[in-house]
Each structure stands twice: as structure tokens, then as C-alpha cells.
Design a protein with these regions (language model features):
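Metal-cofactor-dependent catalytic cores
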Residues: 1-190
Length: 190
């Protein structure tokens, strides 16, 4: 996937703030899995219609299990950062075009309120036949997020309101393996 960031004008802080009301309208208890993206290698993206979630591997075929983390004790993949999930309305705002959503680097994009008040750590979500659990590890943007979506977007997702709503997304782990499909309901189970 080519990034083509030079062809895209990044939104200003005011333009991003104007999109908050739409993001806040995200469903609270039951939403939709809008997009599945597998990252087979660094910076590579595969858009999938269906995928398997596994206890050890996370999203099967994703490179999470091969990526080290400075946040893990042994420097290996962080077990509480197995899945990166972003609100579909938030990514639609910062990316400006559906073909740019995968550039965010998350594996799952859901139309669901990801705020800490709605999905505190420990909350379980069913997606297809799988169940995942929200973890306490914060999900923050990186230099790639800035280059793809702009400095104002990074400041927006990491602002006070951005952190309250988890606009950059949340981390989760698989607690029951299963199959997921784009269009599946995403339901709070606990």
C-alpha cells in the first residue's frame, strides 16, 4: 500500500474539533466491525473481509507476535497490546478517505464508543465467534501517525478529550479464539 501522504492536506485542529459530535454519537453497547487490517510485515497492510483471532497470535497472520515492545518485561511482543482497535468515526475524520484508514496501523476499526467511561479495562467484547478484552495499556500515536495524518491530528487524539474518548484507539487481547467478519456486531459482554 502506498501512503501518498503528500497528496493529502492534513486537517487543522478546528476541523478536527468540528468532528467530535459525530464521534460522540458512536453506539455504546453494540456496534459494527467496519474494517479488518492485517499487518504481515512492518508498514505492509492487507485488508481482510474475514479473519481468525487466536489466543497466542492475536489476529492470525499479523506481525504483532514478531514485534518487540519497550513496554514488555522481556522486550518481546506485549501481551496486553495484542490487538489495536480504533473508532471508525475517529479514523474517518483524521484519514479523510476510507482507503487511508489502514495507515493508522490498527487491526480492527469499529463503530463503537471506545471511551474509557464506556469500555474500561477488563470490558469484554464479542465479535463474531471471538471474545476480546480491553487492556489498560494506553494506545498513543507515533511519528508515522504524524506523517500520515498531521501534527494537529496527533495533538487531537492525545488531547484531554482525545484521551477520554480514546480517539487514538484502545488495546485488547483475545480471550476466546474465533472467526470475525467485516459487518459483525461488536457487543459488550461484561
Amino acid at each position: 500500500m502506498h501512503e501518498m501522504t503528500s497528496d493529502v492536506r492534513h486537517l487543522t485542529t478546528d476541523e478536527l474539533l468540528a468532528g467530535l459530535d459525530e464521534i460522540r454519537r458512536s453506539p455504546k453497547d453494540e456496534g459494527i466491525l467496519a474494517l479488518i487490517v492485517r499487518r504481515p510485515t512492518i508498514d505492509a497492510r492487507e485488508i481482510l473481509e474475514r479473519a481468525a483471532l487466536d489466543l497466542q497470535e492475536g489476529l492470525v497472520g499479523d506481525s504483532w507476535s514478531l514485534r518487540g515492545s519497550s513496554r514488555s518485561i522481556d522486550g518481546g511482543p506485549h501481551p496486553l497490546m495484542q490487538l489495536n482497535i480504533m473508532n471508525a468515526r475517529a479514523v474517518a475524520l483524521v484519514a479523510q478517505s476510507p482507503h487511508r484508514w489502514p495507515l493508522a496501523g490498527d487491526q480492527l476499526f469499529v463503530d463503537l464508543d471506545l471511551s474509557g467511561a464506556n469500555l474500561p479495562p477488563g470490558t469484554r467484547l464479542s465479535i463474531g465467534s471471538a471474545v476480546i478484552e480491553v487492556t489498560p495499556e494506553p494506545h498513543t500515536g507515533c511519528a508515522k501517525f504524524v506523517s500520515r495524518f498531521g501534527v494537529d491530528a496527533m495533538k487531537f487524539v492525545n488531547s484531554t478529550v482525545g484521551r477520554e474518548l480514546n480517539l487514538r484507539g484502545i488495546n485488547a487481547r483475545v480471550v476466546r479464539p474465533g472467526d470475525i467478519h467485516v459487518g459483525d456486531l461488536v457487543r459488550k459482554t461484561e
